[in-house]
């Protein structure tokens, strides 16, 4: 019998027998078996328990199997034969219609009235079946006709295009030769036939080169180009002006007017979606080798063309092609100034009836609490999942830190750290923190930067290492370290095996020895210079490993242990002033936030529950149970709010005040995997501040936060006697 029958019978039984369901002792035992048959051999594993305990596992396995079956069915499509109606009917019957991916404008935020009113967000990878239009053909149809026949008024570009852009955005920005390399012609023709039958769905399993060819074919098959026949010559004239220095500024004004005032609304929306996406591709040209110039050459001819009625002049054709490429390149390079935000994604009639505070934008811009989140950049380059990020600045003449020349370090699970310029988001260099050639490699636990001498500290299974902000190795202490925290007294507290090591920052230089730079030690973390080996004070904790720490108030450090114990230490006397049991199996994440002169410590871990403690009373103020989001991967305090990354790939923002139990926002869609690190980065140019998200999908997304002009942005983590944010000692990645 099918497993669906068991699930339906269970639901009926559960609805009529609540007393039994609530008492597992009276429930009959069931067994789940995994059987693998390979040749003549059979392998199996079984698990026995009650209905209630095993039902979530059964549902999860059943959903995964169904999803995989759909993927296999999708790959087994055949090319439809126009001369055979029977084969066409067979194809229609066997096609599996999946959910179309949401557009970048619809990715992932669900506002909440309270925790009690949970709403289900749709993952970009989990798609619901769309209703197939009566005439589902996509290729060769005018843009206005195509959009008019789609029932949804929220999305003002074709669903087929939106799905391709989102799948490429989530999974393929780093693919070498994106839009330049072609896919298999047979696969392209198969997929084109499927699309014209109404299946517009895409997934991470799709060949990105097939998707890019389909997108270019769609644009070339339009009866009229996106930039229209009527405006073709005007766009080329704007290209000439921009290319001529004396009238360059006027040329950009002409181009901006052509885009925002002269183009039909549907054409403008689609053009902005496309250029917006190409901008993200170009940002990662060091990885995909597709910069603005290369992209303009392969994409420009799909945006601009004009049907010639007479014989072609090769010289004129070459000159025109150069202008088309140039104007496309300029749109990619100057996207932010040429395109008006927000992009209109609803019809004018619908837009006029929407509330003033709504924001129907195609670029993901999300409003909450008087703020607007807008994606600014997406950075690639890591080959493994990102575990930690930290912001560090440069030291001034007094030895204090300042943000000028600041860096962001991102550290992946393979022990490779990439260093970025925090302001222009440009990659600077890569440093090997863990020597993977030694003893099978090592594990990464935590990374922080200090506010006193602006050094970067990394805790791994091999050693505790100290770096300058540019990747020079200053010193190291052999042995495993799990958690890090900078105290209020110019010290670094390090959680090791059954011991707390405390190192003074006095005497530790902020710059590595000249003969021991990261260039000298990029293979094994050791150069020719004499490395510092600081000696610390030890607080022995028999049988205890501190998994997470954070500093609180003027002289407190709070920490959570592997034995589910919460500790509070006095940083001056080094004494334990409070100790209690915490109801969390593996408390690995901590953050502190100050609300109305009281500091609250937020703690989470593998169980997915959130516990909020009052720093004055040491009492549990509030507990938020796991609402189905599973493990907690990061907790950060940003602008009077708590930002938490969960296993379900969602970042949820909570008000810092535990009395307010609402979830302000569910932020999801810029990553295909868990967000494992969150940091705030001020904008030194005086613009909107940034939040950086590091993910297990090996990428970093950077969101700018536009604050309501009536309110002022408050950097929660800026230390009052310093000019830059401090680093929280969140936790180890044990």
Curated annotation (Swiss-Prot):
Pfam families named among the record's database cross-references: RhoGAP (PF00620)
Keywords: Cytoplasm, GTPase activation, Repeat, WD repeat
Molecular function in Gene Ontology: GTPase activator activity
GO biological process, one term: small GTPase-mediated signal transduction
Domain spans labelled Rho-GAP: 141-339
Annotated site location: Arginine finger: 180
Induction remark: Down-regulated by phagocytic stimuli.
Gene3D superfamilies membership: Rho GTPase activation protein, YVTN repeat-like/Quinoprotein amine dehydrogenase
Key word Glycosyltransferase present: no
Gene Ontology CC terms: cytoplasm
Role description: Rho GTPase-activating protein involved in the signal transduction pathway.
PANTHER family per record: RHO GTPASE-ACTIVATING PROTEIN 68F, RHO GTPASE-ACTIVATING PROTEIN GACL
Protein name from the UniProt record: Rho GTPase-activating protein gacL
Source organism per UniProt: Dictyostelium discoideum
Lineage, top ranks: Eukaryota, Amoebozoa, Evosea, Eumycetozoa, Dictyostelia
């Amino acid at each position: 019998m099918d497993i669906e029958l068991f699930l339906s019978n269970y639901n009926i039984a559960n609805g009529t027998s609540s007393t039994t369901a609530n008492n597992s002792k009276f429930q009959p035992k069931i067994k789940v078996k995994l059987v693998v048959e390979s040749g003549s051999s059979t392998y199996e594993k079984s698990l026995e328990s009650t209905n209630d305990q095993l039902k979530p596992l059964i549902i999860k396995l059943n959903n995964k199997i169904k999803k995989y079956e759909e993927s296999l069915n999708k790959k087994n499509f055949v090319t439809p034969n126009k001369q055979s109606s029977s084969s066409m009917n067979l194809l229609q019957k066997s096609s599996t219609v999946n959910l179309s991916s949401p557009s970048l404008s619809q990715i992932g935020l669900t506002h909440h009235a309270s925790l009690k009113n949970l709403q289900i967000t749709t993952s970009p990878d989990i798609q619901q079946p769309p209703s197939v239009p009566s005439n589902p053909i996509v290729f060769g149809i005018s843009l206005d006709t195509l959009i008019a026949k789609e029932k949804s008024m929220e999305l003002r570009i074709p669903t087929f295009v939106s799905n391709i852009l989102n799948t490429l955005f989530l999974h393929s920005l780093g693919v070498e030769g994106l839009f330049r390399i072609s896919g298999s012609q047979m696969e392209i023709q198969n997929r084109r036939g499927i699309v014209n039958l109404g299946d517009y769905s895409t997934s991470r399993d799709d060949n990105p080169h097939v998707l890019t060819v389909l997108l270019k074919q769609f644009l070339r098959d339009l009866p009229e180009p996106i930039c229209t026949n009527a405006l073709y010559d005007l766009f080329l004239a704007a290209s000439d002006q921009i290319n001529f220095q004396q009238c360059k500024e006027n040329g950009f004004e002409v181009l901006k007017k052509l885009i925002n005032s002269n183009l039909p609304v549907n054409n403008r929306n689609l053009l902005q979606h496309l250029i917006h996406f190409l901008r993200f591709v170009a940002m990662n040209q060091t990885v995909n080798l597709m910069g603005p110039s290369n992209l303009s050459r392969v994409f420009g001819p799909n945006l601009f063309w004009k049907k010639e009625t007479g014989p072609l002049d090769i010289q004129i054709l070459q000159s025109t092609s150069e202008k088309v490429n140039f104007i496309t390149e300029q749109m990619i390079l100057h996207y932010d100034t040429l395109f008006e935000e927000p992009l209109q994604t609803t019809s004018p009639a619908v837009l006029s009836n929407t509330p003033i505070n709504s924001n129907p934008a195609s670029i993901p811009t999300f409003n909450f609490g008087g703020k607007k989140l807008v994606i600014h950049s997406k950075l690639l380059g890591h080959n493994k999942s990102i575990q930690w990020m930290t912001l560090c600045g440069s030291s001034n003449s007094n030895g204090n830190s300042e943000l000028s020349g600041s860096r962001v370090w991102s550290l992946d699970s393979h022990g490779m750290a990439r260093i970025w310029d925090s302001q222009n988001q440009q990659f600077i260099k890569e440093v090997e923190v863990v020597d993977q050639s030694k003893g099978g490699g090592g594990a990464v636990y935590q990374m922080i930067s200090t506010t006193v001498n602006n050094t970067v500290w990394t805790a791994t299974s091999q050693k505790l290492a100290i770096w300058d902000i540019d990747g020079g190795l200053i010193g190291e202490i052999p042995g495993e370290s799990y958690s890090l925290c900078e105290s209020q007294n110019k010290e670094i507290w390090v959680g090791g095996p059954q011991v707390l090591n405390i190192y003074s920052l006095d005497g530790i230089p902020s710059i590595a020895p000249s003969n021991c730079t990261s260039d000298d030690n990029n293979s094994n973390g050791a150069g020719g210079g004499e490395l510092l080996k600081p000696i610390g004070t030890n607080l022995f904790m028999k049988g205890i490993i501190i998994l997470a720490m954070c500093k609180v108030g003027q002289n407190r450090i709070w920490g959570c242990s592997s034995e589910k114990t919460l500790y509070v230490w006095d940083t001056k006397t080094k004494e334990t002033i409070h100790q209690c049991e915490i109801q969390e199996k593996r408390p690995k994440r901590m953050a502190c936030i100050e609300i109305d002169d009281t500091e609250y410590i937020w703690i989470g871990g593998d169980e997915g529950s959130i516990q909020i403690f009052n720093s004055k009373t040491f009492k549990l103020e509030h507990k938020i149970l796991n609402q189905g989001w599973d493990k907690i991967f990061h907790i950060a305090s940003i602008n009077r709010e708590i930002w938490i990354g969960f296993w379900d790939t969602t970042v949820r923002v909570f008000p810092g005040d535990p009395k307010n139990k609402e979830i302000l926002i569910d932020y999801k869609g810029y990553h295909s995997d868990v967000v494992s690190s969150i940091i705030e980065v001020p904008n030194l140019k005086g613009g909107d501040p940034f939040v950086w998200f590091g993910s297990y999908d090996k990428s970093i997304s950077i969101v700018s936060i536009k604050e309501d002009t009536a309110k002022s942005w408050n950097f929660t983590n800026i230390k009052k006697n310093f000019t830059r944010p401090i680093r929280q000692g969140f936790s180890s990645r044990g």
